[in-house]
């Protein structure tokens, strides 16, 4: 008998959802940084064996939207509650259980199995952990609570074991050689954006969108032209930096990661353009692939 199903990872920003996703799938599918709101899209990572297929989905952190981009991010998160066979609700030892009560209330009424994962336990102590477990039991009495550390991979194997046990019998949903639902260009976008998140401060990383305008691949190399969009001229200057040094650093670091990701020589050219207030434009958000409905 073959098992298959959709396992969706949800939770607040910066609790370690993307790190967990990568640990479960065994591939670096989602970018992960120390900054909140790193993930903007719903990203599938597909784990295959001969008799099983697990379709994991990493989702943006739950937040109160302040502009249309964040509305789209919240849509990705809430839609993950409607099509899961198993839900992984990720919290951590820092945030309080009463954060985003409305979303937790939706999770509490779900009829599918819910694994509540308390992440980053390597940063806490036993007494604090016991308090959190009791608080979450009161909020989500039907959930199975598992303390984990996605970074050190503590209990990640146990989470995978429980997921496998909870999956329904089903034929596979995707070809067995497929490991994600995203095209190659998407990962180029994400890797470049990850470097911007790491190397720039304040609002700059959140005002950026990356678009691959050219992706030409042959047996040994890939030529990539990527445009970094910002909202204002002042942001363009900051991204480029003095004598272009800041942008060069981003491109150099991104190229190294892309070569590891694709296993080929990468020729990467980056450009910076202004798209005024794109985060609040329905048209531009749709052009960039965001879900608005």
Question: Where does each model-flagged region fall?
Answer:
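Canonical P-loop GTPase G-domain recognition
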Residues: 113, 122-180
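Catalytic P-loop NTPase motifs of RecA-like helicase/translocase cores
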Residues: 39, 62-64, 96-97, 124-125, ...
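Active-site phosphate-binding and catalytic loops of NTP-dependent enzymes
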Residues: 30-32, 99, 171-175, 198-209
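Conserved glycine(s) of the Walker
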Residues: 16, 155, 246
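Active-site glycine-centered loops adjacent to acidic/histidine catalytic or metal-binding residues
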Residues: 58, 119, 149
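P-loop NTP-binding site
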Residues: 184-293
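Conserved G1/Walker A P-loop phosphate-binding module
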Residues: 1-81
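Conserved C-terminal guanine-recognition region of P-loop GTPase G domains, centered on the G4
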Residues: 51, 75-143, 216-218
